[in-house]
């Protein structure tokens, strides 16, 4: 026996306080928890009584809840700004479903999360989070007076997306950042496309679709004359507002394709293929819709288009979903198309302590957004 640390059960006394050892900490030149060489080593690694206080492997619930709350507040603030265009623009009414699906994807990813890794220095991430508040505050301020300005929507969405990646990295290191990226990426499907790009895409695809529809009508024995994106038949002229639903079918098909890709667990390459196939299918179905509307107008007159317009658009959505689901079932049978997801390791290393500070920073910054916006406009009105 002796008076060293081994005789006191691996504890050191320092003015009445106890210093606890952690696995991996070096004491007397040897890491705690590693098997030492030699028979007479006083701290056998296999004997738990010599390790009175090891690092807990159970996840830190407080850190986890801070992680959840910070992410929730960020995305709720974004969805609150996007809700205006979801409600006023029928092209983006599918946006109401995106938060629900994104939450499901995040919950699914959480149940299969890998073991977290300790990130390196956390202060650069905290500085980056603080820096992201500047563009987010600017976009939030402008959207208060111009709620339909889509570049500001994307600026705000980009800041929220980047902040979410930083939070995931702080909580579980690079493994969590990679694992949860798709859940954050999917939520961006709710953001409207830039207006100029949307108008250009709609116009170009409508021109091509009108030409194809005119060719099909002429091949079927129905005289059709195409002028730009208008189709003239014997009963009247069908304009783009009658024959093309804009980008609704494209964004909704893209959303469904991304959702099925996660549901079936496809690899990245097959998810991209599924998304492209969904967009192509939506466009071909849109041409079929033009053809159906022309035939309906020829049988019942131009006025009947009001009765066929919305049902035809709804049919496109259902057919697109059915096609993507059938294609997903077929792709699932291909060898190597899917990735087996394993349940989350229990217990796993605790999340990094820096996530608590970062989450508090995010919560405070997000709470300041409406306050600074209101203060700004009150100050401007007082001038």
Enumerate the predicted regions with their spans.
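Compositionally biased regions
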Residues: 4, 37, 48, 57-58, ...
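Tryptophan (W) side chains
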Residues: 41-43
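Low-complexity, Gly/Pro
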Residues: 9, 31, 38, 48, ...
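Short linear sequence elements within intrinsically disordered, low-complexity coil regions
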Residues: 26, 33, 52, 381-382
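N-terminal functional modules and adjacent low-complexity/disordered segments of proteins
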Residues: 16-18, 46, 288, 374
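Residue-identity detector for glycine
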Residues: 2-4, 9-10, 16, 24, ...
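Hydrophobic N-terminal alpha-helices or hydrophobic patches in metabolic proteins across all domains
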Residues: 54-383
């Amino acid at each position: 026996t002796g008076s060293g640390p081994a005789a006191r059960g691996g504890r050191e006394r320092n003015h009445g306080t106890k210093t606890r050892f952690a696995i991996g900490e070096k004491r007397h030149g040897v890491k705690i928890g590693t098997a030492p060489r030699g028979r007479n080593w006083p701290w056998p690694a296999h004997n738990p009584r010599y390790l009175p206080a090891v690092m807990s492997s159970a996840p830190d619930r407080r850190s986890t809840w801070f992680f959840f709350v910070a992410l929730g507040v960020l995305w709720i603030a974004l969805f609150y700004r996007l809700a205006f265009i979801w409600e006023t623009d029928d092209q983006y009414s599918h946006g109401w479903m995106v938060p629900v699906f994104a939450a499901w994807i995040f919950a699914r990813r959480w149940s299969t999360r890998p073991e977290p890794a300790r990130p390196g220095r956390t202060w650069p991430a905290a500085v980056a989070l603080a820096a992201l508040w500047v563009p987010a505050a600017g976009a939030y301020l402008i959207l208060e007076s111009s709620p339909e300005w889509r570049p500001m929507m994307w600026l705000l969405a980009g800041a929220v997306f980047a902040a979410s990646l930083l939070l995931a990295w702080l909580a579980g290191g690079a493994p969590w950042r990679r694992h949860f990226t798709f859940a954050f990426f999917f939520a961006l499907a709710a953001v409207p496309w830039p207006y100029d790009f949307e108008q250009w895409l709609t116009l170009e695809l409508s021109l091509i679709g009108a030409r194809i529809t005119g060719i099909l009508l002429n091949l079927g024995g129905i005289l059709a004359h195409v002028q730009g994106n208008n189709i003239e038949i014997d009963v009247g002229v069908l304009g783009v507002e009658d024959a093309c639903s804009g980008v609704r079918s494209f964004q909704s098909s893209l959303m469904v394709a991304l959702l099925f890709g996660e549901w079936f667990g496809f690899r990245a390459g097959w998810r991209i293929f599924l998304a492209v196939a969904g967009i192509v299918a939506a466009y071909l179905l849109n041409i079929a819709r033009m053809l159906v509307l022309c035939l309906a107008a020829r049988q019942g007159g131009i006025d009947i288009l009001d009765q066929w317009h919305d049902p035809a658009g709804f049919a496109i959505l259902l057919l697109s979903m059915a096609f993507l689901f059938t294609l997903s079932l077929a792709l699932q049978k291909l060898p190597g198309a899917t990735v087996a997801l394993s349940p989350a390791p229990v217990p796993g290393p605790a999340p990094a302590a820096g996530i608590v500070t970062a989450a508090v920073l995010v919560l405070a910054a997000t709470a300041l957004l409406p306050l600074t916006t209101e203060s700004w406009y009150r100050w401007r009105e007082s001038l």
